[in-house]
């Protein structure tokens, strides 16, 4: 997933921070900032919000299987990360004046990290074997696009940053990998069919199977709590004009992410159903612990002609019961529930002093 693409639709988030010391011990007990600063009055499902990062662009923080750690990606010049790299933190640490442990190579660009079973290794995608430098951003034009870097491959690594295994090794884009709750399967997005489709594989990279086969950018997939279903977002162009534009952009390794809806299917791709029909960009879905609802990011409620506003929403799998969860005026996204369902981690532009920084926050979840 192109992490900061949709943030860029509403505001450029390339932030800058003061240089921090290389202290990977962190600060136990995240710095307390008043609840009034971190929470909006209408955020009734969130309690005791705590800020974990304090500068740069931090996103896609995902819990370890035991719920004690988070792995996330960040772009932060103060951390010597000019483009996204992968870091790990304990949930009771914060990183205001120090730098978290780097667990990617520090080369190329990375995306979409996730813990593997046992919590001593992670999975993530990286371009470092294709080029150790940050890949170029796409040119800014009349339309907003995400790059689909063909150098992205999927790797496993230990928490010291050592590559253990390369799980994919073929021409084209392989990224956006997440792991099933039982730890036996991986779902990811690939262009190996000529389109951006979902695939599954065993935890060791074997038995790769195609899941989706309709034209469009299928990505950002997660398993349901019982591991039987996949939830994901897709662009799914329909009209002749939309199809042509999608294919033309994909031929340039680009996609336009401004119109996406959410879908659910069985792990083998059967029983595919569309969950949302809200228009605009609906993405970053994650299952509620009950397995009957999903939390996701959307800008469908933005005022026409105004700046897009991205917030978290909850919806039933059948598309009913839409409820707004967060209310930042610019950006809330990348939600994930802890394995026991008691906490929610997410990224937000709140409490950034009017800068373009996106930080990580963790909160107690209140039903």
List each language-model region with its residue ranges:
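Residue-level detector of Asp-centered blade-edge/turn motifs that repeat once per structural unit
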Residues: 65-66, 117-118, 181-182, 225-226, ...
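C-terminal motif of bacterial Sec signal peptides marking the signal peptidase cleavage site
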Residues: 14-15
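Hydrophobic beta-strand positions that form the internal "hydrophobic ladder"
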Residues: 70-71, 122, 186-187, 230, ...
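Sec-dependent signal peptide recognition
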Residues: 2-8
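A flexible loop/linker signature enriched in serine peptidases of the S9 family
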Residues: 54-57, 74-86, 104-110, 125-153, ...
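Sequence/structural signature of beta-propeller modules
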Residues: 22-40
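Multi-bladed beta-propeller domains
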Residues: 34-57, 89-109, 157-173, 203-217, ...
